[in-house]
Amino acid sequence: MGPVMLDVEGYELDAEEREILAHPLVGGLILFTRNYHDPAQLRELVRQIRDASRNHLVVAVDQEGGRVQRFREGFTRLPAAQSFAALLGMEEGGKLAAEAGWLMASEMIAMDIDISFAPVLDVGHISAAIGERSYHEDPQKALTMARHFIDGMHAAGMKTTGKHFPGHGAVTADSHKETPFDPRPASVIRDHDMAVFKSLIAEQRLDAIMPAHVIYPELDPRPASGSAYWLKTVLRGELGFDGVIFSDDLSMEGAAIMGSYAERGQASLDAGCDMILVCNNRKGAVSVLDNLSPIKAERVTKLYHKGSFSRQELRDSARWKTVSAQLEQLHARWQEAKSA
């Protein structure tokens, strides 16, 4: 299993993509909206990807809900994380969050997709990149909601990815466009933001973690996603996390501080990442594959989905019908509340 996760251009594979997927360093593939036309096409694309690849790839997507949902038409419209507690309260919201985790994971597993990068564990709604993707501004309540969603995902047969360690919720800058700084004291970052990750790791509820492309100058001069302090000293050492560490997308402007694509990839692996994401830049991905030293990402093999059922079997179930309707309704209520 190789340590590189990359993407493909369209609805089906071209010859160059088949060649790239057969590279021994490729271990994962992430799907985007541009790869989706309809459920039958998506299922066929995943089949082509599995067919072309040398390794048994981890196929991933961002299908967390709210504004980050790559596949919409033909799938349940998932509400934003913030909406569960905000509109339903902690008890009712928690129950539906668990069902949302189950439904989201089930809809993806029916497509033979292994993981959706979820849940978001960032605390608070002020960040441009996070906002409504956060469950709550109170760490304890965010933890409770995330716990429900995670349990639903696990029940469906999907592994979880907590993001963005140690917490992206308090920075207003968007790391897709620049490298944000979080100048708050170390004690606040650790006791407020990191507390959610710490609890879920102790409970063994997180199978993977995606670190933030954020610099916390009070603790380390490098972005957490490329920092041995955050990934090795804190995450592995102090918190005892033994799951998969993903880099965030090395094509984001926030990662440019780490040099060329090959340098960014190597720096992320050296810092402690198991798998690096190189998306939306074919040249960058090829450069990483050409220049990275051969390495195996054994931990990543733990992320394959469990269960095998068709989309039709899922949609015929009473549980899916009930939960799908509830989630669509909450999504509509949330959109209305935001525009009021």
From Swiss-Prot:
Keyword Cell wall biogenesis/degradation among UniProt keywords: yes
Name of the encoding gene: nagZ
Protein name (record): Beta-hexosaminidase
Active site, per annotation: 176, 248
Organism: Klebsiella pneumoniae (strain 342)
Subcellular location, principal: cytoplasm
Residues given in the record as substrate binding sites: 62, 70, 133, 163-164
EC number assigned by the record: 3.2.1.52
Pathway(s) where this gene product acts: Cell wall biogenesis; peptidoglycan recycling
Site positions per UniProt: Important for catalytic activity: 174
Function: Plays a role in peptidoglycan recycling by cleaving the terminal beta-1,4-linked N-acetylglucosamine (GlcNAc) from peptide-linked peptidoglycan fragments, giving rise to free GlcNAc, anhydro-N-acetylmuramic acid and anhydro-N-acetylmuramic acid-linked peptides.
Annotated TM spans: none
Top-level division of the source organism's lineage: Bacteria
Catalytic activities: Hydrolysis of terminal non-reducing N-acetyl-D-hexosamine residues in N-acetyl-beta-D-hexosaminides
Compartments it resides in: Cytoplasm
